[in-house]
Amino acid sequence: MIVADGSEKRGGTLRARKLLLGGLGLLLLVASGSSFYRHRHLEESVVLSPDVAEVKKLSEYFDGIRGTVNDCNVYFFEGEEPGATLFVMGGTHPEEPGGRLAAWLFAENAVMERGRLIVVLSGNRSATTVTRVGGAYPTDFTIPTDWGAQTFRMGDRWSNPLDQWPDPEVYIHYPSGQSLAYVDIRNLNRVWPGRPDGTLTERTTYAFLELIRRENVDVFIDLHEAELQYPVISTIVTHERGEELAIFVSMMLSDEEFNIGTEYSPKNLHGLSHREVGDASQAISLLFEAPEPFLDATRGRTTREQLLTGVDEFVMKAGEHGLLFEHIDEGGWPIDVRVGRHTSTVLRTMESWTELHPDRPLSCRGVPRYAEVIAEGLGHWLHDPSAAAPGRLVTE
């Protein structure tokens, strides 16, 4: 009887433990599922600039992405006078918010005086709905504004596995046949020029290339940020057809606003926008990189504060040991500095293009430059959705 009582007692304890652990697991499942759902469905408001003439869907250029998460908004600005066409893309890598927010300032503030402007805020919209697995990234971040605050989705470098899965053991780039990392089949900046019958990410770049061709884009700009341990940083990466323009922009910015270099797109590295867009279309393709300490492997706590201030003592320590390709000090690399670098570089590209091609000018007003963004904060140029005029509010 004593043995039986002991067995019953142990059995009851085991059942209680199973119930407790099962309950805890269910609680974690509900909590994480709720967080994932809120992240994926967080709505981001865009108050359209008075100069936005039209907002199209990317699927108007390729029906193969219609109804998918990557059927993003495309914003069109028509200049008061004719000129060239410039396409600015943010959100290729949504874990690099400086590029996306710089494009946002154009969407909400730009007024084209000469030429046309096309803006995309969420190049890989799928990647805005997930953060890096195991990276402990925040799911969102908030920018203070004159009217309160605006919250944005934090994203990843790759498309959400919920939208594209599984990954191959080795990713074979089309059409070059080059072998790349398996996960890069979900990287928008490794699948250019795309293909109509490919994965979601490949179909997305195919759609963008159709847009570039049909709209006769003259200059394509892809906005990015990079970790300080990455050698391609604080620079303009250019296709060989854009060398003169990129060097002109770099020279003028380095003389008047901030230092920025020039890199040449490698001809034997495929899938990147600065190579494939220039090869497959009439457009000059450029890629801008700004520093983002949040991405460094040697960073400290991965928090919203670190994302927005760019302050990190561990990245600074790496710099003391000569491991960085860009300087960092106690001031870090705040989001205002990173966004300001991009807005000034885009505006300077328009000015330099116009000097080189006076018969096809580009001119824009209303968008703040580097010093203005730092002085006022980028939130000063984000507009209150509740005060938007009828028909001038859209959702990303």
Describe each region flagged by the PLM.
Residues T85-L86, V219:
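Structural motif
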Residues P97-G98, E113-M251:
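Active-site/substrate-binding loop(s) of hydrolase catalytic cores
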